[in-house]
Amino acid sequence: MAQQQKKRRKRKVKKCKLCEMKVEYVDYKDLRLLNEFLTDKAKIIPKRVTGNCAKHQRMIKIAIKRARHMALLPFIKL
């Protein structure tokens, strides 16, 4: 019997949105940008989903945590 060959799909390489915008610093007061990296339950979206590089993902994480501490963003949404 001939074995069937599985067709492999090439994954689309996600590019860091912040690298393309040439962002050097993610500010905790920029809520419009930070909300793009939060789920509807206010959880931080992982970098494998967003396609961010490690450097910018760390900056986003720190900025979101600072904004939460300053009560600019909620910790959870119900």
Curated annotation (Swiss-Prot):
One of its GO terms (molecular function) is small ribosomal subunit rRNA binding. Signal peptide: none annotated. Pfam families: Ribosomal_S18 (PF01084). InterPro entries: Ribosomal_bS18, Ribosomal_bS18_CS, Ribosomal_bS18_sf. SUPFAM superfamilies: Ribosomal protein S18. GO terms for biological process: translation. Keywords: Ribonucleoprotein, Ribosomal protein, RNA-binding, rRNA-binding. PANTHER family: 30S RIBOSOMAL PROTEIN S18 (PTHR13479), SMALL RIBOSOMAL SUBUNIT PROTEIN BS18M (PTHR13479:SF40). Belongs to the bacterial ribosomal protein bS18 family. Binds as a heterodimer with protein bS6 to the central domain of the 16S rRNA, where it helps stabilize the platform of the 30S subunit. This is Small ribosomal subunit protein bS18. It comes from Pseudothermotoga lettingae (strain ATCC BAA-301 / DSM 14385 / NBRC 107922 / TMO). The lineage of its organism: Bacteria, Thermotogati, Thermotogota, Thermotogae, Thermotogales.
